[in-house]
Amino acid sequence: MGQKINPLGFRLGTTQKHHSFWFAQPKNYSEGLQEDKKIRDCIKNYIQKNRKKGSNRKIESDSSSEVITHNRKMDSGSSSEVITHIEIQKEIDTIHVIIHIGFPNLLKKKGAIEELEKDLQKEINSVNQRFNISIEKVKEPYRQPNILAEYIAFQLKNRVSFRKAMKKAIELTKKADIRGVKVKIAGRLGGKEIARAESIKRGRLPLQTIRAKIDYCCYPIRTIYGVLGVKIWIFVDEE
């Protein structure tokens, strides 16, 4: 049943690890989960709010000399386009937040971290705890399924053919240190009235092997024809 379950949860404790590290009494556990969601949503909203509208950013592809012009103007559903994941570690008086991000230009600006910490403090409304935020840049951005999904979303919103967008996403992974990748898009592809699914695959993808380190993401894309769903599996290595 490897294809019927979330690949990340299926491998939790073996090749995947938790993104939240804290202990709580059973009666306070739900409050801790809600607090984690507020922290992650606040960080994503901060990045979306401070993004320059209509600005363009050039990303040089690792797989070729092609330079991709990446439009930063996103809708409200794409606020986390460069964040791969956020780790939260809680102590008695400190909440450590580690943001793993592909392109941390926005958060490297002077005063950005301090401003984000103030926003989090207001959101959580906790007097006894302070925030300690650190940024971790992802070494190989196009090895991350979230970033590839954002690239596909940008292409589809600009009326690029879905097959061409999938092939370009596969090309971006060619020089990344991975052993296999699969991209699947479902919905009203090309504006057709009947929804269908299309996929493209390169290399191996052993979904039923628990020791296989597989990264996965599911990403919704809002288009004029409705919502398209993008799923990306990346086979990194086998332990």
From Swiss-Prot:
Q: Where in the cell is it found?
A: Plastid, Chloroplast
* Region feature Disordered, mapped onto this chain: 50-74
**Entry keyword annotation includes Ion transport:** no
Keywords from UniProt, A to Z, are: Chloroplast, Plastid, Ribonucleoprotein, Ribosomal protein
Q: Does the keyword Transcription apply?
A: no
Q: Name one GO cellular component term.
A: chloroplast
Pfam families noted in UniProt: Ribosomal_S3_C
Cite the KH type-2 domain residue spans from the record: 43-139
Q: Which domain of life is it from?
A: Eukaryota
A GO molecular function assigned to this protein is: RNA binding
Q: Could you tell me the Gene Ontology terms of the biological process aspect for this record?
A: translation
On subunit structure and binding partners, the annotation says: Part of the 30S ribosomal subunit.
By its UniProt entry, which HAMAP family does this protein fall under? Ribosomal_uS3_B
Q: Which family does it belong to?
A: Belongs to the universal ribosomal protein uS3 family.
Under what name is this protein listed? Small ribosomal subunit protein uS3c
